[in-house]
Amino acid sequence: MARRIRKSLFANPFKSALRALTQAAVKATRQAVTKASRKAVRQLTKPARRAAKPMARKVAKPAAMRRNKPTAAGASAGTNAGAGASTRGVALGPSGARRYLLFKPPGARKAAPLPLLVMLHGCAQDANAFAASTRMNRLAATEGFLVIWPEQEKLANSQGCWNWFDTRSGRAFKEAASIIAAIDQVCARHGADPARVAVAGLSAGASLAALLATRYPERFKAVAMHSGIAPGTAQSAATALAAMQGRRAPAALPVTLAGGGDAPSLPPLLVVHGSADAIVRPGNGHAAAQVWADASGALAGAPRTVQRGQRYLVTVTDFKRNGRIAASLCEVAGLAHAWSGGAASQPYSDAKGPDASRMVWAFALRQFRADA
C-alpha cells in the first residue's frame, strides 16, 4: 500500500504536466495550421484576381475592335490610330518566300491609289531596324505614301545581306524578281499606284535597288542608292568585297531586262554617299552616278555645296540630259557607312548628316510629278 501511495504521489504531477504539454502542443499546431492555411489562401487568390482582369478585358471587347501592338516600324511613325498602321505580309517569288513589312498612312483605304516607296535594308539589319533608323514611316504618315520593307531571309544569306552581287549564278536576279512579286502584291491588295513606285536602299539594299532599276526600268519612277555599289561592278562574293574597297568599277551599266526587248529609259538615280565610308568606299558613289549618267547620255553640271545648320556639308553634282536629271550625286562630308540624318540610337545611322529620308522622298516626288 505504501508503494501505491508513493506511485500516485509521483504519477499525478507527471500526468498533469504531460496533459498540459499536450494541450499546449495541440494549440500551437492549430495556430500554425490556421496561419499557414490563411497564407496559402491569400497566395492562391491573388493570382486569380490578377488573371481575371485581362480576361475580362478580352471578353468585353470584340477581337475586331482590339488594336494590335504596333511594331517598331509602326512606332517610328507614332502609335496612335492617326499615325497609320504597319502590317506583315509574305510574297512568293523565284527566290522563295520573302516577308515584308508594309506601312499605310492614315486614310490609306479611303483615299485614291497612293505612291509606293520600296525600302531595302542593309546587311545585319531587318525591316524593323531599317524603319527605326530611317524613320521613313513618320514621313510617309505626313506625306501620304505607302512604304514596303522587304526582308532578306537568313537562310539565303547568313548576314542578312541581299545577294545583289551574285549575277553569275542568277541568284541576284531571282531576289530582284521576288521584290517585284512583293510590289505586285501590295499594288493589288493595298491600293498602291503601280505608276508611282520608287525604290531605295542602304548598302547591300542600295545595290539591289539599282539592280532592280536596270532589270525592271519600266516599273520605277526613281531609284535611290545610299552607300551602295552600281550593277556590273561585281559578279561574286569575292569581287563584291573588292568592289567595296574601291578596287573595281563597272565599265558600263548592264541593263539586262527581265522580259527581254529594247531597254526603256532608266529611272533617275539619287546617290548619297559619305566621304568617311570605310566599308563601301566613296569612289563607289562617284562610279554609280557616272555610269548611270553615261547610260542615259547625261552630262555633269557644276558641283554646289549645301549645309543646313550644324549638319554635315553636302556637295551635290547633277547629271542632266535635255534639262532633266538622270543622276544626282550627294557627297556627305564626314559621313561614315550610315544612313544620313537617321535615328541616333540605331546602328548604321548618323543623326548629324542631312536627312536622307527627306532627300529620297523629295527626289521621288519630283519624278512622280514630272511624269504625271
Predicted regions: what is each one?
Residues 168-190, 211:
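Alpha/beta-hydrolase active-site loop
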Residues 114, 122-126, 335:
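Active-site glycine-rich loops that stabilize anionic/oxyanionic intermediates
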Residues 206-218:
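Short glycine-enriched nucleophile-adjacent loop
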Residues 271-273, 277:
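Short beta-strand/loop motif that positions the catalytic acidic residue
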Residues 191-203:
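Alpha/beta-hydrolase fold nucleophile elbow
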Residues 151-174:
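Cap/lid segment of the alpha/beta-hydrolase catalytic domain
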Residues 152, 224-233:
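Active-site nucleophile loop of the alpha/beta-hydrolase fold
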Residues 1-116, 128-134, 142, 146, ...:
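A domain-start/cap signature at the N-terminus of enzymes
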